[in-house]
A protein has these predicted regions:
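Flexible, glycine/charged-enriched surface loops at secondary-structure junctions
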Residues: 113-121, 209-222, 299-303, 314-317
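A conserved active-site cap/scaffold subdomain adjacent to cofactor or substrate pockets
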Residues: 158-159, 168-214
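Internal, well-ordered alpha/beta segment that forms a basic, Gly-enriched binding/recognition surface
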Residues: 114-179
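Structured beta-strand/loop patches that form or line metal/cofactor-binding pockets in enzymes
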Residues: 222-266
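Active-site- and interface-proximal helix/loop "cap" or "latch" segments in soluble metabolic
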Residues: 184, 269-329
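Short beta-strand elements
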Residues: 135-136, 149, 252, 259-277
């Protein structure tokens, strides 16, 4: 394993750097990156951005909005938020096992006198309060796992910048965003800064991987990262995309995540459909959207079409029947 030192605080640039390491540095079997963003909302690959953020608030407070490559939900970052990325060519060995990659974080906190545990489908918690969410993405047999650690994030901003749907709050059985999360610094017996904590995470990674050395980005690497930053990750089209035309909207939440569908139906035939949500999956849901064009807008017809493919590649831990019900009642 090698680690990349990244001192940038630009959210779109940091996503571009991470994406470059993931998609282009394929000769490196394993890579590790720690990074910190200025105030930003990072939305999941499949989310409808405008429904996840309070845009008036983010605009007024200069909070950058960026879309990442992995699924899952939207998260708020600031300069007291620590993000980590692990990239591996061993995609098949730990597919969707978030727990394995969270162990260095849990071990670091144990050294600092804090007991953390892995819960739910992708959370790390201290005494039932979430401090880290994780997500994964896959590309040509390569896997990227990343997490955001709430170290000393401004909770008042977090609660105002993000929209949290009523169905998600109810499914968690709690009243608000702030009730569900904690800052690591508030749990530490002895306080430290986010940069000191970052150093401790890197030290722990070196214990887990004694042969780990630094990968220094070349001028060519940096030029290509800058190009993807300008052409993809810092663009309006990537972050917001086009608002879907639709005649039928459905929103369904399962334990494995939420699916929102916007279907344009004419004469009972699906002309187009857009699928959003905080679910996880290896495949690109545009495959599903294209598959359903021309299918009668009836549950049995949609289900039959979906059964021609392996839907778990796109919607992890969901049945084909559940996916069909998210599209048509």
């Amino acid at each position: 394993m090698k680690y990349i030192v990244n001192t940038s605080n630009d959210p779109a640039y940091n996503i571009a750097l991470e994406a470059y390491a993931f998609r282009e540095l394929v000769d490196e079997d394993e890579l590790f990156i720690l990074w910190i963003n200025r105030p930003a909302i990072i939305v999941g690959k499949h989310q409808n951005t405008i429904q996840e953020i309070n845009k008036g608030y983010t605009d007024a407070h200069d909070i950058k909005v960026v879309r990442r490559l992995s699924g899952g939900g939207a998260v708020y970052h600031d300069l007291n938020n620590l993000n980590y990325t692990i990239i591996s060519n061993k995609a098949d060995e730990g597919a969707f096992d978030f727990k394995i990659f969270s162990q260095p974080v849990i071990a670091t906190l144990a050294d600092l006198g804090v007991k953390a545990e892995f819960t739910g489908r992708n959370d790390l918690e201290i005494d039932g309060k979430k401090f880290c969410g994780n997500a994964q993405a896959y590309y040509k047999g390569r896997m990227m796992h990343h997490g955001c650690l709430l170290f000393d994030v401004d909770m008042s901003v977090l609660g105002q910048a993000l929209k949290v749907s009523k169905d998600k709050v109810e499914s968690k059985g709690v009243k608000s965003v702030r009730a569900r999360v904690t800052n690591i610094v508030d749990e530490l017996p002895e306080k430290c800064t986010v940069n000191e904590f970052s150093d401790k995470i890197l030290e722990k990674m070196k214990e887990f991987y004694p042969e780990m050395t630094e990968y220094v980005l070349s001028e060519d690497d940096l030029a290509k990262i800058q190009e993807s930053y300008e052409k993809q990750f810092n663009t309006w089209d990537w972050t917001y995309g086009q608002s879907p035309e639709y005649t039928v909207e459905r929103n369904v939440r399962y334990p494995a995540g939420k699916i929102s569908t916007y279907a344009n139906v004419e004469n009972s035939i699906i002309k187009s459909v857009k699928i959003y949500g905080d679910f996880f999956g290896i495949g690109d849901v545009s495959d599903i959207e294209e598959l359903l064009v021309g299918v009668p807008y009836e549950y049995e017809d949609v289900l039959a079409k979906l059964k021609t493919i392996d839907t778990t590649l796109y919607f992890s831990h969901m049945t084909t029947e559940e996916v069909a019900k998210a599209i048509v009642a």
